């Protein structure tokens, strides 16, 4: 990514109702070889009673980290599929061992960036969005009952958002012995922004609001503000946002802006005037001493 550098920020909150935060957020830069960096971005939204959702979400993240830190291939798609498969097997086995009443699961959205290449892996109803040219586009596909209804034309997007069945997901890690992962491959352009979020966030914010915040704020600040606004809008779920900006190098390397109302050369002019005044003062003192 010679023309841009990835800047990442994240925020997560248990929300106003739940004691435990069953969301897990992860981002890190892994260096395989010099100049070959992988940036891993992930959000998992766990589910299950007795804090089992929190365990499932963390197991998914831990498995993802394990797979990419012990990489024996440079095939990102393959590693993603392997990470999802292994995480599903571990979560399913752990939940099954405790009996049906302790079954657990989690969504997982992962973005892997290498150079200008972006690969998204997804299971569940957490989402990955791309902001390009001031427009927000959902990359991932929700694995939920209402999403399937919308796809079949049986329900509108507005009806899906208000539906009492909106939290019923049709695919998750740990629910079955095997799981299918959706893979999306894109090319990042300078000034693109990526948002990965749990449903506690995107179910309560309008697209235009999310775009505005990401364009006007840094990734860290926009992630925090989106989480805060989702809670203000009535979210009772755990709320998570991870924002990545492909910041143009020209923007990052630009000199800091001059304070408002202060001309660009103001500091330099003040310095010159002080020096001129000092020279005049020394000349006057010298003249007085010469005349006495």
List each language-model region with its residue ranges.
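PP2C/PPM-type serine/threonine phosphatase catalytic domain
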Residues: 1-292
């Amino acid at each position: 990514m010679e023309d841009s550098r990835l800047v990442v920020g994240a925020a997560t909150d248990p929300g106003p109702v739940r004691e435990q935060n069953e969301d897990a957020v992860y981002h890190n830069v892994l260096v395989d070889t010099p100049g070959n960096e992988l940036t891993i971005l992930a959000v998992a939204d766990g589910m299950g009673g007795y804090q089992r959702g929190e365990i499932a979400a963390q197991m998914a993240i831990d498995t993802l980290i394990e797979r990419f830190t012990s990489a024996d291939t440079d095939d990102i798609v393959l590693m993603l599929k392997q990470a999802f498969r292994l995480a599903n097997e571990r979560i399913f086995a752990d939940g099954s061992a405790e009996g049906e009443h302790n079954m657990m699961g989690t969504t997982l959205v992962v973005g892997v960036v290498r150079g200008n290449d972006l690969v998204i892996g997804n299971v569940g109803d957490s989402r990955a969005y791309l902001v390009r040219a001031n427009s927000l586009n959902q990359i991932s596909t929700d694995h939920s009952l209402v999403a399937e209804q919308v796809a079949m034309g049986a329900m509108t997007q507005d009806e899906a958002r208000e539906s009492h069945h909106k939290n019923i997901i049709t695919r998750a890690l740990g629910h079955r012995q095997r799981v299918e992962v959706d893979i999306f491959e894109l090319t990042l352009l300078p000034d693109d922004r990526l948002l990965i979020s749990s449903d506690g966030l995107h179910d309560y914010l309008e697209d235009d609001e999310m775009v505005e915040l990401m364009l006007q704020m840094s990734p860290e600040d926009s992630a925090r503000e989106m989480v805060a606004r989702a809670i203000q809008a009535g979210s009772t779920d755990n709320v998570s946002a991870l924002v990545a900006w492909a910041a143009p190098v020209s923007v990052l390397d630009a000199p800091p802006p001059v304070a408002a109302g202060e001309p660009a050369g103001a500091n330099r002019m003040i310095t010159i005037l002080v020096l001129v005044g000092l020279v005049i003062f020394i000349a006057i003192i010298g003249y007085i001493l010469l005349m006495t």
